[in-house]
Structure formats: C-alpha cells, structure tokens
Amino acid sequence: AQEIQEQKDELIMLLDSVKAANANTVYFQVRGRCDAMYKSSYEPWSSDLVATRGMDPGYDPLLFAVEEAHKRGIEIHAWFNPYRYESVLHQWDGTPQNYRESHPEWLLDYSDGSILNPAMPEVRDHITAIIQEVVQNYDIDGVVFDDYFYMSGTTDDMDDELYQQSNPDNLSRADWRRQNVNKLIAQVYRMIQSEKPYVRFGISPAGVWCTDATIAERYGVTPTPVGSDWAYDDIFCDPMAWIQEHSIDYISPQIYWTIGSSSDYTLIAEWWSQIVRQFGCHFYSSHSASDLSSAKMPSKYGKTTTGTLSFDLNGEKVSSKALSPIERKTAEENEYIVDGATASFKGSELVNQIKVNRTYDETGAPGSVFYNMRKVTHTSGMLSLLRSDVYKYPALIPAISWKATSDPGLVSNIAFTNGQL
C-alpha cells in the first residue's frame, strides 16, 4: 500500500509541475515491451511497474493518470511501442503470457532483442485489438506511437518466406517492409475513427525522414535538407506515407539536435512545418531534454575517438548507454566529445527551439513535446524559464480543422470565482 501511494504521489507531483508550466498534454507510456501499465486482457502487467512481470500492482495506473490529469485540465495520450518485445533475447522466459510459448512464429529475433513481426496480419490485428481495448475502456485523449519499428539489422533470411508469399505488388524488400508498417498505422487509425474519432492518433519517428531527392519526388516534396536516411532505410519508417495517406492526426518527429549543429534543428523544423501545411496534419516537434549534449553542438567541439558519450545536465551525469536507439543514432552522426569529458546545455536552447517552431508555422506552431518529463521537471529553473518566456499563458489543444466534428453546443456548468475559471 505504501508503494502504491508513493507512485501516485510521484505522478501527482509531475502533473502539478506540468500544470504549473502551462503545458496541456502528457504522453503516458502504457505499453513498452508487450506489457501493460493498465488492466489488459491481452498482456501482463509491466515489470517497470512491479517487481515481477505480471504481478498485480494493486491499482490501475492509467486510470489514475487519466483522472488526475483531467482534474487539472491536462490531456493524456496513451503511449505505445507497437512492436518491441524483448530488450534481451529470452528476457521473458518463465513469465506469464510469453509470446515465445504462445506465438513463437510472431517474433523476429535480433542480437539485442526481439520484436513482433510487422509483416504478419495476425500481429497487426493483435496490436490493433490491444489499442482498441484501451480506447474503449479509458477516457484517453490520444494514442501515440514511439520510434520503434523494425529493428536495425533485419536480414533477408528473417522474413524471406513472408516476402515471397505476401508481396502481390512486387515491391522491393525495403518498400514491402515499409508497407507492412504503414498497414498497421492505417488499421489503427481506422479503428480509432470507428470507436472515438475525437481521440487523436500521432507518431513520434526519427527527426529526419529521407534526404534522397528521388524518393522525395514520389511524394511531391523536397527531401529533408540535412541528416541521414537511417530511419527510412534501416528501420523502414516512412512518415511521409502516413501524412499523405491521412492515417495520423499529428507527427512529432524527434529533432534531437541543437540549433546550428551539423543536423541543424532550424532547417529540419522548417522542413516539417512545410510538409504538414502541404498535406494537412499537425506538427508537434519532439525536443530532447535528456540528449541535448555537445554531441549535437557546432563543430567547435571537434571529432574524437568513439566511446561512451556522457554529459552533465545540471550536475547529473547521463551516459549514452541509457539513450533510445534514435538518441544513440543522432549522437553517432554528430561530433563526439572525448571520453570522460562532459558538456552542459542551457534551458534557453529549448526556448529558442520553440521560437523556431513558431517562426516557421503559419499558425504559430501547434505544439512541442519534451522527452522526458522528469528532465524538464527536475532541471533547476526549467519550468520557471518556460513559463516566464514561451509558455506565459495556458493554451488550448489545437483544433483538427480537417476532420468533421459535431457542434458541441453551449458551455454549461462553468463558474469564474476569485480569478479562477
């Protein structure tokens, strides 16, 4: 009971901090590795929540998060990793609802983990059903996917049989894999529209789409001006397809570089702003509070030997080993600092990035996303800086103007007392 209350108290503290910063939405991770931070009919309780995967925590964290967030006028988007299963092979052996026992054919194994196979219709149906249960049973405001699709290093032999059997359009293997991901995203979007069309669906992919002019020409767009094609070529992620097919409501690319770096934040943010205006979609730039280091600073830091990158964030040393695949990739593509050295960044970098977003978006930029909340709330002075500069006033959730909605009617049950609405 004490641990439950401690978890609830910590979440309330975080939500109060979000409210104090005049932010309006929280992405609450509900499924990290085919597990659940809510009462699921399909998958076990998450080991990030309890000591042993599958152990009942004694309460429903998602239900609690939704109730407390809504009390504060904050939206909750349920954050899913659609495919990721294990961070280490056979990690869940001996635990409840183990797919290695029930559906071993669903898994693609890599040296550093496993995922559900995006090529299998049964997998797409299963993931959609998992998300549908959350949409039906919880008063969430949105659904968001993280940056995990295929894992890097998918060899031909891993899916050759399916490629030969289920490729009626005779696509290249890479295009076929991207199509598999696109099918899931379109299927989830259709499900949400049929259940609760007001629930927003977004994805947070890598910050760079594709720099290949030939591929960009297929979509009638310009290529991303800087960066590499790692996400498009290696993990088979094609955000342009989702935007053009209108199978998402918003895109939140992880632009984890600083202004003036070799992959300049300004250039990438401007490009995404142009893309969403062209096709009709919201752009909520994802900013990294955990990975803004000298690895992404201008080249005055110089290149050095490889090694573990570390940086100092207001006195807290953070290792690159703790970063997500996209965070690690962005670090690899930029200038490293020497082993053991540290660098720091100021909150003003995030403020300036928000101002860049507003400069290039004709509506003042619908929004920004910060990864992760703890870094923002626990960095001394960060919340007050945001509130004193770019978030002086509370903001409404941006309207999705391209979707038909019913007239909500006149507002009722509202009062203004002592300066509070």
Regions found by a protein language model. Give the residues of each.
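Aromatic- and glycine-enriched glycan-recognition loops and surfaces
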Residues: 3-21, 48-72, 176-187
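Aromatic-lined carbohydrate-binding/catalytic grooves of carbohydrate-active enzymes
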Residues: 21-57, 250
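Substrate-binding cleft of secreted/luminal carbohydrate-active enzymes
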Residues: 25, 236-262, 272-404
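Active-site beta-loop-alpha junctions enriched in small/polar residues
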Residues: 31-33, 81-85, 147-150, 206-208, ...
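Polysaccharide-binding and catalytic clefts of secreted carbohydrate-active enzymes
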Residues: 7, 24, 95, 101-247, ...
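Active-site-adjacent "subsite" loops/lids of carbohydrate-active enzymes
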Residues: 1-8, 67, 78, 83-137, ...
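Structural preference for beta-strand elements that scaffold enzyme active sites
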Residues: 25-27, 73-79, 113, 141-144, ...
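Conserved aromatic anchor
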Residues: 419-421
